[in-house]
A protein has these predicted regions:
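Juxtamembrane intracellular "pre-TM" segments in multi-pass secondary transporters
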Residues: 1-12, 192-223
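Substrate-agnostic recognition of the 12-TM MFS/MFS-like secondary transporter fold
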Residues: 14-30, 53-66, 76-86, 107-165, ...
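Small-residue hotspots at the loop-to-helix junctions and early N-terminal turns
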Residues: 42-51, 144, 252-259, 343
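Central cavity-lining transmembrane alpha-helices of secondary-active solute carriers
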Residues: 49-68, 260-269
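Helix-loop junctions on the cytosolic side of multi-pass membrane transporters
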Residues: 177-201, 389-399
Length: 399
C-alpha cells in the first residue's frame, strides 16, 4: 500500500501520463485500422469486424482482472503488456505489403486482438492504481481529470491518425510504434511496493467475483445499461468511416476531425461532469436522450461541416455522464476486487462491441448509412429511458 501522500500524488500523475500517451497511440490505431482495412478490402463488414476485434479479448476480461488482482508486481505486468502492445504493431507491415485478401485480413485481425488484449491488461492495472492513489473524496474529480486528459490525448491521436495515413501506411505504422513504446516510460517511474497479501485460487477468485456481482444490484444494472449503449455507440467507428470515405468521398483528415471533435466535446463535458451533484438518474437520463437524438439527426445531414455540430454535442454529453457514473461505481468496489469487477463489466458490458462493427457494416451493406444512424440513436435513447426502471442506479447519490 502507498502511505506517503506525496508519493501517491506523484504516482497518480504518472498513471495519468501513461494513460495519455497510451490513448494517443490506441486512438490513432483504431482509426488507422478502420481506414486501412476498408481501403485494402473495400468491404465494410470486414472493416467493421476489424474494429470489433479490439474488444474480442474483453470476453476474457474477467480472467484478466483476476490475474491482475492476484499479481504481486502490477508495475511489471503493466510494463510487459505495454511492450507486447508496441511490438504487435509490426504485424501490420505484413498486412499492407501483400495483395492476398486472406493474408491481409489474418494479420490485421491478429494485430488488433493482441492490441485489445494488452490494452485490457493495462486498463485493469490503471483501474487499481486509480483506486489506490486517490482518496475516496477525490474519486469524482480524479475520474474527470483522467477523462479530460484521456480525451485530449485521444484528440491528438485522432489528428495523428490522419497524418499517419497521409504520409503512407509504412511510415505511419512506424510512427505509431514510437508513440506506443513511449507509453512505457511513465510506468517505470511509478513507485509501488509488491502486494504481499495472501492469494486465493483462481476458482475462488471467480466465485468471489460472481458473488459480488450477484449481491451488487447497481453493478448488474450498470452492465445491462452498458450492453445497450455500447452496442450502439461502438457502431460509430464504421458509420463515420463509410460516411466520410464512401458517401462524402473525403480524405482521412475529415475522418479524424470527427473524432477530434468528439474528444473535444468530452473534455468540455468532463468539466461540469466533475462538479455535478444529485441523483445519478436525474443527471444521465436527459444526457443519453440528447445523445441519441444527435446520432439520429446525422442521418438527415448532407454536409460534413453540419455533421460536426451534433458530433461535438455527443462528446459533451458523454463527458458529463462518465465522471458521476464512474465515481458511483468506484465507491462501491473494494480495492482488492477492482480489477476483477472491471473485468466483469468489460466481459458482460463492453465485449458486446465485438459484434457492433460487423452489425453496423452489415446494416450499411443491406440498407444504408441513413438507417444505421437512426438505429444508433434509437438504441441510445432506449438505454436512457431504461434507467427509469433501474432503481438502485437511478437513485444513487452523486456527492
Amino acid at each position: 500500500m502507498i502511505e506517503d501522500l506525496g508519493t501517491r500524488r506523484k504516482n497518480f500523475k504518472l498513471t495519468v501520463s501513461n494513460l495519455a500517451i497510451s490513448r494517443v497511440g490506441t486512438s490513432a490505431f483504431s482509426l488507422m485500422i478502420l481506414w486501412i482495412t476498408l481501403q485494402l478490402t473495400h468491404i465494410p463488414a470486414i472493416a467493421g469486424l476489424a474494429d470489433g476485434m479490439f474488444t474480442l479479448p474483453l470476453f476474457f476480461s474477467f480472467f484478466v482482472g483476476s490475474f491482475v488482482d492476484r499479481s504481486r508486481n502490477k508495475k511489471m505486468v503493466a510494463i510487459i503488456a505495454s511492450v507486447l502492445r508496441s511490438v504487435s504493431i509490426f504485424l501490420l507491415f505484413i498486412a499492407v505489403s501483400t495483395h492476398v485478401l486472406a493474408v491481409i485480413v489474418f494479420f490485421i485481425f491478429l494485430c488488433v486482438v493482441i492490441m485489445g488484449f494488452t490494452s485490457d491488461i493495462s486498463n485493469s492495472v490503471r483501474a487499481i492504481w486509480e483506486k489506490v492513489f486517490l482518496k475516496e473524496e477525490e474519486y469524482q474529480k480524479g475520474s474527470a481529470w483522467m477523462m479530460g486528459i484521456g480525451s485530449l490525448a485521444e484528440m491528438v491521436g485522432f489528428i495523428a491518425s490522419g497524418i499517419f495515413i497521409y504520409i503512407g501506411f509504412l511510415r505511419g505504422i512506424s510512427a505509431l510504434f514510437v508513440v506506443l513504446a513511449a507509453s512505457i516510460i511513465p510506468i517505470i517511474f511509478i513507485i509501488q511496493k509488491p502486494d504481499q497479501r495472501e492469494r486465493q485460487s483462481v476458482k475462488s477468485d471467480m466465485k468471489e467475483g460472481l458473488k459480488f456481482l450477484k449481491e451488487t444490484k447497481i453493478l448488474q444494472q450498470m452492465i445491462f445499461l452498458m450492453i445497450i449503449a455500447n452496442l450502439a455507440v461502438a457502431m460509430m467507428g464504421i458509420a463515420f468511416t463509410v460516411l466520410v470515405e464512401e458517401i462524402f468521398k473525403l480524405n482521412s483528415v475529415y475522418f479524424s476531425i470527427v473524432f477530434v471533435l468528439v474528444s473535444l466535446g468530452i473534455v468540455l463535458g468532463s468539466i461540469p461532469g466533475s462538479k455535478v451533484k444529485g441523483k445519478l438518474g436525474v443527471i444521465i437520463i436527459p444526457l443519453l436522450i440528447v445523445t441519441g437524438a444527435m446520432f439520429a439527426s446525422i442521418a438527415f445531414l448532407h454536409s460534413i461541416y453540419l455533421t460536426y455540430i451534433p458530433v461535438v454535442v455527443i462528446g459533451f454529453c458523454v463527458g458529463m455522464i462518465n465522471p458521476p457514473a464512474e465515481s458511483v461505481l468506484i465507491k462501491r468496489i473494494p480495492e482488492e476486487m477492482m480489477a476483477r469487477t472491471i473485468g466483469i463489466v468489460n466481459t458482460m458490458g463492453v465485449s458486446v462491441t465485438f459484434f457492433s462493427g460487423t452489425i453496423g457494416g452489415l446494416i450499411i451493406q443491406f440498407t444504408s448509412i441513413f438507417y444505421l444512424f437512426l438505429i444508433i440513436g434509437a438504441l441510445v435513447i432506449l438505454s436512457g429511458l431504461g434507467i427509469f426502471f433501474m432503481k438502485e442506479l437511478r437513485d444513487s447519490p452523486v456527492k
